[in-house]
Amino acid sequence: MNQLSDRLNRLSPSATLAMSQKSSELKAQGVDVINLSVGEPDFNTPDHIKAAAVKAVEENYSRYSPVPGYPALREAISAKLKNENGLDYAPAQILCSNGAKQSVCNAIMALVNAGDEVIIPAPYWVSYPQMVKLAEGEPVIVEAGIEQDFKITPEQLEAAITPKTRALILCSPSNPTGSVYSKEELAGLARILAQHERAVSYTH
C-alpha cells in the first residue's frame, strides 16, 4: 500500500541520479564510461579549505548558525561580489544556504500555490519541474533550441504567460548548456515580466 502523500506521488525520480547510478554500474563492469550526469568537480577540496573546516571544528564553531548565515560570512560574500563582480549587495541582502537546490526549492515553496504555473526554459536542470510539482504548481516548458543558443526570446515568454503564471525560472549561465543571457536579452525579458504584476523572475 502506497502511504506517501499525493504531493510526493506526483514526483519522478531524479534523472541525474539515475544516470549516475547507471554509470557507476557500467564502470564496475569494466566499461569505459564518461559520466556527464552529476556535476561533480574533477579536483579535490583545496587544502586551505580543508584546514579552515578542521580549525572550525576544533574551535567548536559547530552550533546552530543564524538563519541567514554568520555575519562574517555574509560580509565576506558582500566584499567578494563587489571586488570581483562589480555588484553592490549589502550583507543584509545576502542569505546563505546549503546550496542552490535548497535555495531554489525554498523560493518556489514561498511563491507558488496549487495550480500556479511556473515557466521553465528548456533545456533545464532536471530538478526544476519536480520542485514546482512539489509545491502543487504546474511547470510550463518553453523550448529554446541550439538555433537560438538555448535562450528564450521575449516573444516566447509573452506567449507562455497566462493569468495563472506565477514565476519564470531563469538560469544564466544555463545548467546544462552554459549559455549566458546578455544584458540586453535580460532587459527584453524584464520588459515582458513588468507587464504582468503577478509574475516574478527567479534567477539561478
Feature-to-residue mapping (PLM):
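N-terminal small-domain helix-loop-helix segment of the aminotransferase-like
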Residues: 2-99, 106
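Short acidic/polar active-site loop segments enriched in Thr and Asp
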Residues: 32, 166, 199
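Flexible low-complexity scaffold tracts in large eukaryotic assembly proteins
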Residues: 172-175
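PLP-dependent aminotransferase-like
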Residues: 91-92, 109-170, 180-184, 188-191, ...
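Glycine/Thr-rich phosphate-binding loops of Rossmann-like dinucleotide-binding domains
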Residues: 44-46, 104, 128, 177-178
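Conserved small/polar residues in nucleotide/adenosyl-binding loops
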Residues: 203-204
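Short helix-capping segments at alpha-helix termini
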Residues: 84-88, 194-199
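Short N-terminal helix/helix-N-cap motif within the alpha/beta-hydrolase-1
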Residues: 99-105, 122-123, 178
